[in-house]
Every structure is written in structure tokens, then in C-alpha cells.
């Protein structure tokens, strides 16, 4: 699952992307148009790793939507 969000207002022009692959979640974010955006990789371990990764991704998506980001 890969989702892309943007937040734009008078002073901000940001993006945020989440990529869920099995037990790993990759978050990429920064100003729209920059060459090297920041990236965080979170790996989950254990029997429920895939489910934990899904819950984490859903939580982060809710957080960004609450802050005003729009899914593109």
C-alpha cells in the first residue's frame, strides 16, 4: 500500500508519503519539489509484525488527515 498526501497553505507546501510492504513502513516527507526528501524506515518484528505495521500506518494516516493533509 502506498499513499501520498499534501498540505498547502499560505506558508506551507509540504508532502508526506507512506509505503507499507509487509512488515516494513517507509515514511517520506518534505517540501514539495525538493530533491532529497527525508525518509524514515520502520521495521516490525515478531508474530504480529504485519498487523502491527498496518496499525502503525493507519495511525499515521489518521494523524496527517487530522492535521489537514489531503490525499492525492
Task: For each feature predicted by the language model, list its residue ranges.
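Broad hydrophobic/π-residue packing in well-ordered secondary structure
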Residues: 16, 25, 32, 47, ...
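Mixed-charge, Lys/Arg-enriched low-complexity segments
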Residues: 36-72
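Short aromatic-glycine-(Arg/Gly/Cys) micro-motifs in beta-strand/loop hairpins
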Residues: 20-43
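Short N-terminal "domain-start" leader segments
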Residues: 1-26
Amino acid at each position: 500500500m502506498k499513499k501520498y498526501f499534501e498540505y498547502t497553505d499560505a506558508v506551507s507546501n509540504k508532502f508526506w508519503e507512506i509505503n507499507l510492504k509487509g512488515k516494513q513502513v517507509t515514511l517520506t516527507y518534505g517540501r514539495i519539489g525538493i530533491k532529497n526528501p527525508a525518509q524514515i524506515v520502520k521495521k516490525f518484528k515478531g508474530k504480529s509484525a504485519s498487523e502491527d505495521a498496518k496499525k502503525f500506518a493507519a495511525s499515521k494516516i489518521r494523524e496527517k488527515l487530522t492535521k489537514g493533509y489531503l490525499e492525492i
